[in-house]
Amino acid sequence: MNVRERMEQEEYEFLSPQAQKAAETKGRPEPEDDNDVRTCYQRDADRILHSKSFRRLMHKTQVFLSPEGDHYRTRMTHTLEVARIARTICRGLRLNQDLAEAAAYGHDLGHTPFGHAGEKALSSMLDKPFRHNEQSLRVVDKLERDGAGLNLTYEVRMGILGHTGDFIPETLEGQIVRTSDRIAYINHDIDDAMRAGILTEADIPAQIAEILGHSHSQRINTLVENMIENTMLTGTLGMQPDVAQAMDQLRTFMFARVYTNPVAKGEESKAKDMLCRLFEYYMKNPERLPPDFLPQLDFDGMERIVGDYIAGMTDRYAVHKYSELFIPATWQVR
């Protein structure tokens, strides 16, 4: 028995009957030999973590566009927080932590530069709405590894797709990633908003703070612990109704006070205009696309490929390409 086989056996011994077992995966789009050391979900997490798309999350906006300060969240720090929350909940419920971690690592790979401003920009240019969860699945299925994709397991792929939107993953681990994403972004966006001077702790509605807590750590702790304890008590995945309602109310509060605040969105129109102009440029000049994108034109069409290229940009790379293409360079006398 090798290391992987021993770990798969231990999953049957220690995990809940409701947990997704690595040995029972529905498999990958292209069959592969098993690894001697890592389970299939561990391999998926490693593939995502070592991908170029994951590294680019470091330079993609979470909420605040181009903030002045080193402590604001990026897509990467958000992703890491989601993964930790998901693992904690899965550990408490004896579910598969490796599956949840892999889906969490991949859930935002398809996000555009400049956050949801970029998503809106591409939606205005494409023939159908741009949805980052669908793009995240496209990244791992088709765009990574120069078009070969990462060949991830079905359960991780559906966890990525179902972290937002109407589709609900069939595994409990995938559903936990969905909840962990919301727990993470609501709470760390409050923290960033306080850092930006948009909010103070006293601004949080009293009835919400009374239930969830009066600090960043208290709120996350309340939500995570309640998710675990209520699920164990009821046998159904979820928080107590009053706690779930308080989280929804906090999210509504954030939309009213932060997500539409001029400080957070002050540069959004500029970001949209920049990406739309880049999109138009590459539609007219496809030969200027990177060479590795060109072979896909015959299969996916110009609009889709240009959208892939722009969605994959980091904030600073989009600014660089815009400056390179549209801003006159300074003459240098030699």
Task: Tell me what each language-model feature is.
Residues 1-75, 79, 83-89, 96-97, ...:
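Histidine-centered, transition-metal-coordinating active-site segments
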Residues 99-125:
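Aspartate-rich (DDxxD/NDxxD/DxxxD) Mg2+/diphosphate-binding motifs
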